[in-house]
Amino acid sequence: MPIVKVRENEPFDVALRRFKRSCEKAGVLSEVRRREFFEKPTWERKRKKAAAKKRLLKKLSRENARRIRLY
């Protein structure tokens, strides 16, 4: 859990912004959304496999775009 210590004479808004940023970096909100409902192991594997496929296609399309720009 991210911890933010409020500095002396620091406005609440600034401290809240720092806390939100640290929560985002730690992935707290995405973890809560992921754990909101039970996910069967088969669904989890399917989701991870789809994410890996998406990453691979994205990487390949970026490499292909670079090749096209070189010519």
Curated annotation (Swiss-Prot):
A GO cellular component term found in this entry reads: ribonucleoprotein complex
A single GO BP annotation from the record? translation
> Per its UniProt record, what Pfam families does this chain match?
Ribosomal_S21
Keywords recorded for this protein, A-Z: Ribonucleoprotein, Ribosomal protein
Any one GO MF term held by the record is: structural constituent of ribosome
The family database entries (HAMAP family) matched by this protein are listed as:
Ribosomal_bS21
Which family does this protein fall into?
Belongs to the bacterial ribosomal protein bS21 family.
Name recorded for this polypeptide: Small ribosomal subunit protein bS21
Q: Which source organism?
A: Pseudoalteromonas atlantica (strain T6c / ATCC BAA-1087)
